Regions:
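Sec-dependent N-terminal signal peptides
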Residues: 4-13
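A composition/biophysics-driven feature that prefers long, compositionally simple stretches
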Residues: 18-226
């Protein structure tokens, strides 16, 4: 009954209702932007080191519209990467010699904050992705190219059969013979937490403990009745 009165009150008070919706939207946007900041910080702090520990100098993540690779969740996710573009290639390259990690997007339909994760963006038109991808790989001549293909780890198995065939055709047999699974890189990257990640995990564990403690306590459980 109280919920009904609340709904009716909000319905007949459009200004108040709009203010509440605005506050909810504002909080949701703040959480989303904080999530992006946490993911970007992790990438900047740990990805290049993880690639070096696992002996990988290039990592290619392929994606198509509405068929995103699971690992793109680590690099922005919805509103940043993965959901847009006819065909997109998200490429990380370690040039060595104490040079910073190259973070490049080859694709279309980039969102506003894309450059925070991928500062270099190469767009294509009717010529398609293939020539840009071929030139990019050839110019850098990577020794090991990680792709998201794995028999045992689902989050490291995001590339589709079609996208793998497209990638192999684009870069040719010389470079496609250098493909390795990204699973070791992904494990290493995920396992190295930032301070912000640890704070989130700690808060989540505290909330989980509170829910479990209350769920099995006499606050909600009555012996012989519940």
């Amino acid at each position: 009954m109280k919920r009904l009165w609340l709904i009716l009150f909000l319905f007949f008070s459009p200004t108040l209702g709009q203010n509440i919706v605005t506050q909810w939207n504002s909080k949701a946007l703040q959480r989303l932007m904080h999530e992006w900041d946490v993911k970007r910080e992790k990438m900047e702090l740990h990805l290049q080191a993880s690639m070096r520990r696992t002996g990988i100098d290039m990592w290619i993540i392929m994606s198509r519209e509405f068929n995103l690779d699971p690992m793109l969740q680590m690099f922005g996710d919805y509103g940043i990467s993965g959901w847009y573009g006819h065909r997109n290639a998200y490429i990380f390259f370690d040039p060595g010699n104490n040079l910073p990690l190259e973070r490049t997007l080859l694709g279309t339909h980039q969102s506003g904050r894309m450059r925070e994760f991928f500062p270099t963006i190469i767009s294509y038109g009717q010529e398609g992705l293939k020539p840009h991808l071929a030139d990019f790989i050839k110019d850098r001549n990577p020794k090991k190219i990680a792709i998201n293909r794995s028999r045992t780890v689902s989050m490291a198995d995001g590339i589709t059969v079609e996208m793998l065939a497209f990638l192999e055709d684009a870069i040719g047999p010389v470079y496609s013979s250098r493909f390795i699974s990204s699973q070791d890189l992904i494990f290493d990257y995920i396992s190295h937490r930032t301070v912000a990640e640890l704070e989130i995990e700690t808060e989540a564990s505290h909330r989980t403990w509170y829910i479990l403690r209350r769920a099995f306590s006499n606050e909600v459980v009555t012996p012989g009745k519940t």
